[in-house]
Amino acid sequence: MKVCFHINLIFLVSILSSNTFAQNQIVADLSQENVKISTDFQGAKILLFGAYDGKKGDDIIVIVTGPKGLVTVQKKEKILGVWVNTRKVNYINTPKYLSISSNRRIDDILNKKTQKISEIGLNNLKIRVQPGIKVENEKQWRQALTRNMLKSNLWSINENSVTLNKDSLFRSYLKLPSNVITGQFEVKILHYRNSKLVSQQINSINVSKSGISAEIYNIAQNYSTLYGIFAVLLAVLVGWGSNLIFRKVWRGINDW
């Protein structure tokens, strides 16, 4: 990866002074654009690097957004000494993964109004409760959603994690956790000057399953009925086998 990095870095530096670069103002690349998830997947660390037509005091913000969809927040209560889920709220159009990185504090780069308009920040995401669900204290549910996603490492804010060099080069490491969802991930690089957007570029990362986990996933998606029947039969066989072993062990104890 180091060899590829240096080759791409030389390429980026070579176009830094070209007319093409002057028009685009920012170019970026990833050390890995395809991530394969196998049964022993422990996460991935991807290097993002690039060049920009910068000046002293410029800033770079990197936003990585995974597939969006429905995310459920559940409330647990203790009933008769047992914790059970008593209520739930579904949020739609919610990023299943979100990482926001910057070269310094985001509040020092953009004011609150600009952050809200640009959806930069976990509290500025334009997600909403699924229609038809009545929610009391929605603010608390939204806080619980954020707390859950942060705890599971699916959302993160990484300030001071983008390294700038000579107002022309930048790099940052993107970390995907072991529980990351599959799909297309958008990598948006934003170049700011005096709190105003100067240029941007969008790259992408494809996360997919491989090996036996991919086969199981494909069967579950394409043959859901068959997969359900197989899961039930497997559970019955496991239960029957466990019961048989228990009987033999118990009989041996009695004989002894």
Regions found by a protein language model. Give the residues of each.
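Bacterial N-terminal signal peptides that target proteins for export
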Residues: 1-8
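Bacterial N-terminal signal peptides
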Residues: 8-17
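N-terminal edge beta-strand
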Residues: 23-41
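Short edge beta-strand/loop segments characteristic of extracellular beta-sandwich folds
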Residues: 47-53, 173-175
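Membrane-proximal low-complexity regions enriched in glycine and acidic/polar residues
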Residues: 78, 82-177, 181
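Short, aromatic-rich amphipathic segments at membrane interfaces
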Residues: 175, 196-229
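A short tyrosine-centered beta-strand micro-motif
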Residues: 183-189
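Juxtamembrane interface at the cytosolic side of transmembrane helices
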Residues: 235-256
